């Protein structure tokens, strides 16, 4: 089972709202997921991003792969650098 951290679309038509979830890669985009670890609202000004850093860090250490979009959001929040430091600076 390959686990991904990706975005699960919610909200109304033309007003997207994304939940950041941990899901099996074989599940559909808006299908079943294992755990919700944050959300992203690109419509609000300024754009709203909330992440449960402890849970995300735990899943990344277990081997979950973030999607490209989620990876860029995590990099902007500083989580990818934190993971890199924990992994290589023992």
Swiss-Prot record:
Gene3D superfamilies in alphabetical order: 3.30.1320.10
Keywords: Ribonucleoprotein, Ribosomal protein
GO function term, MF aspect, one: structural constituent of ribosome
Any single biological process term in GO: translation
Upper lineage: Bacteria, Bacillati, Bacillota, Bacilli, Lactobacillales
Entry similarity comment: Belongs to the bacterial ribosomal protein bS16 family.
Keyword Ribonucleoprotein: yes
Pfam families hit by this protein: Ribosomal_S16 (PF00886)
InterPro entries in the cross-refs: Ribosomal_bS16, Ribosomal_bS16_dom_sf
Highest taxon of the lineage: Bacteria
Ranges that cross the membrane: none
UniProt source species: Lactobacillus acidophilus (strain ATCC 700396 / NCK56 / N2 / NCFM)
Protein name: Small ribosomal subunit protein bS16
CC per GO annotation: cytoplasm; small ribosomal subunit
Xref: HAMAP family: Ribosomal_bS16 (MF_00385)
